[in-house]
Swiss-Prot record:
Name of the protein this chain belongs to: Cell pattern formation-associated protein stuA
Gene responsible for this protein: stuA
InterPro entries given in the database record: EFG1/Phd1/StuA, HTH_APSES_sf, KilA/APSES_HTH, Tscrpt_reg_HTH_APSES-type
One Gene Ontology CC term in the entry: nucleus
SUPFAM superfamilies: DNA-binding domain of Mlu1-box binding protein MBP1 (SSF54616)
Bias (Polar residues) ranges: 137-157, 469-487, 504-515, 523-540, 586-596, 654-695, 723-734, 745-762
Keyword Nucleus among record annotations: yes
Subcellular location: Nucleus
Residue spans binding DNA: 354-375
Keywords in alphabetical order: Conidiation, DNA-binding, Nucleus, Sporulation, Transcription, Transcription regulation
Species in which this protein is naturally found: Penicillium rubens (strain ATCC 28089 / DSM 1075 / NRRL 1951 / Wisconsin 54-1255)
Any GO molecular function: sequence-specific DNA binding
Role, per record: Transcription factor that regulates asexual reproduction. Binds the StuA-response elements (StRE) with the consensus sequence 5'-(A/T)CGCG(T/A)N(A/C)-3' at the promoters of target genes. Controls the expression of the penicillin gene cluster.
Recorded family membership: Belongs to the EFG1/PHD1/stuA family.
Amino acid sequence: MCSTIVNDLDDYCASLNSSFSKSLYCASHDGRHLRRPLLASSLYSKPFIRATEKLELPSISQVHTRGPADIPWYNPHAAERPLLPGDKLPALSLPTATQGLSRTAYPDPSVTNSTNSSARTSLSSASVPVNEPRSPPSSADLSGTQGRLSLDSSAPTEYSLPPSVNEGYYPSPTSLGSMNQTQPYMDVHSHMSSAQSYAPQGATAGAMSQYQYHGQPPVMQPASSYAPAAYPQYGYPTGVTSPPTGHPPSSMGGQMPAQLLPLPGKLQSQNVIEDYSDRYQVSNHAVAPPSGYGNSTGAPLQGFVFDGTGQVAPPGAKPRVTATLWEDEGSLCYQVEAKGVCVARREDNHMINGTKLLNVAGMTRGRRDGILKSEKLRHVVKIGPMHLKGVWIPFERALEFANKEKITDLLYPLFVHNIGGLLYHPANQTRTNMVVQESQQRRLEGPPPGPQRTPSGSQQGPIHHHHPSLQTPMSSHMSQGPMNGQPGSRPGLERANTFPTPPASASSMMNQGSSYEWGGQVPHTQPLSIDTTLSNQRSMPTTPATTPPGNNMQGLPAYQGQGYDSSKPYYSAAPQTHAQYAPHTPLTQSGMSSYGQPLAGGYMKSEMAPPNPRPGVSEPETSERDSNRYSQSNGPGETVAEHDQEYMQDHNAGYNSNRGSYTYTTNPSVSSLTGEHSQLTPEMTSSPSQQNGSGRMTPRTGAGPPPHWASGYNTPPRPAATTLYNAVSDTRGTPANGASDPYSMASTTAPVYPTGNGSLSAGSKRMREDDDIRAESTAEYETSKRRKTITDATLGGPVGGPPILQPMKPSGVMARHR
């Protein structure tokens, strides 16, 4: 096959006047490379032929890679060597002093026609690979010497270590030429005393260093680029020239296996490696464990004497220690990672996390826990970072366990007495000292008071929860205790006092871009809504940076005028709705929160327990108060003849629209209440009434006096919410402040006067009872209440509709008595 190829090449290569290209082609063909790339490489390298005459080395490397199967091909070509001089490639006599390689010509008996008697060259001295571009060796050398040398297992050991082998020149023809290369290579190295097969050893980055001239000029690369294609399995990342360290062991290792990294005891070639160590970062150690630790497998390395004290670093091990400050314990912790497990050792008492230590040994959980439980002296840590949790045992016991499980070398330098000296590496000595000093200082000072440390942890959690809302324009949500209803907000005010709310001092941070960005996002016009009560009662210590503004926050009162969040479109737009609320500046800040903030339903305060079925109990509020609530919707004292009219006036229309969606059966009654509630503290109203875009209170919110509302709540949903509202408002409105009844809350829907509604009637009855309970409820009032009918609407009772809810009395008097 080769011969036919050569014949084909004759015409093509005639211009080349050398069998060099032919031999290349054959080699390339053997290497399963395309002819064109090889020729290109040979041509490409030609210009350098005259430039330098150091090309012989590459031929040697390729020789090694060649497999015995290639011998027949090369031998015939060896005869053609004489042509090479025409190529101006001097015979092997060319070794240049600069190469630093002394070549000894070894007559090669296998080649009879070799003009180059020095088929083999021994590299007497390890020399750093020359970076100068090397022209390809003469074809005679290439074909003849390579073939003989690579195939000759008896080749002197020198071949195994050609320091400046440029595979790049002929990667495809020779180095990659045969898959068998490793086998001949092993033969070549067989004289080496290492028993291990070289292929595995080649895996080490160091092994490849000699052959891989990552420092080589790009000249080699063109040829090398072809090589990878030929043998993808080698997976040369960048071709032969790529840095040795980067190559997976398999890449070059298959071709030039272990020669580079002698076994620990076999250092024949180590001098070469050392020479290259600077360039290739090959460790001077005979063995360079890939992991950087002497023993990543748990089995002692060859030539490594197990050290039970943990003071001696295993071969090739690099101390990897990190230190962190364990705030909870006030101690510095040294951490060493082994097998993906972080084992920590305290600096103060040198106790070691036995749980993690035994995890490194791969011990089962049951056995591990049993061993640790039997320890007399132990410290159990159940909170904190995962790598610090577990059972801490004394240093001596930990060392015993490590020795018993044979993981002491894996854990190096965990047991080194002066582990602090290894911390971070001398380059960072200053930082190391700083860390150690800080830990010592803290230990001397004693652990910081809990509050100082915890604020960042416990305190921040809640704060962060608020933050989403804080960052939103709704400043009211930000801090108000009432906000509890909101999903992330803190609990109700009653609990807020004990909650880790931000310290009052934090208020100074308001406008600063504190970590929470309190001030920046809250409109200043609307002071942060954090209740002053909260700020005053902060349970947490003052932690300026992280805590939300506290006392500085202007009281919610400022909000009252503004309809909770002016920023909220529906709030600002709804001021009228809010008007019901806002007008009651009397509302406590919390009260405001109930309006401005759409309190989440969850927010309901315990106080907000559903309105008592017996509305009368809390109802004792004066009718005036009721009037205020109602008056909000329509001006106080202003009677609304029609439900619809009231709604329209109140901007309730929006409310009504929301009402439609409102399914609160109790809401109908509640809505009227909402007006009242403006006075109520949000805790009272903490219902999510805000859910209505209008900002109306939800039934509970509205249910300021739970009793009245309770009737509404308890009663089954009224078929017509409006009726409920009417009934409620009627009840409300009729009380002494009937005029204030502007309880416009009555739904805009035409009052359905389901006098027949049992549920409505029941609700109305409750309402009546509530009214009776009212201090103001006089006999006349009650009678008027019962007498209320649709006609009452003219009186301007809240929407007049409410009376409809009232069951018609047999004596039903059409006119309402005011």
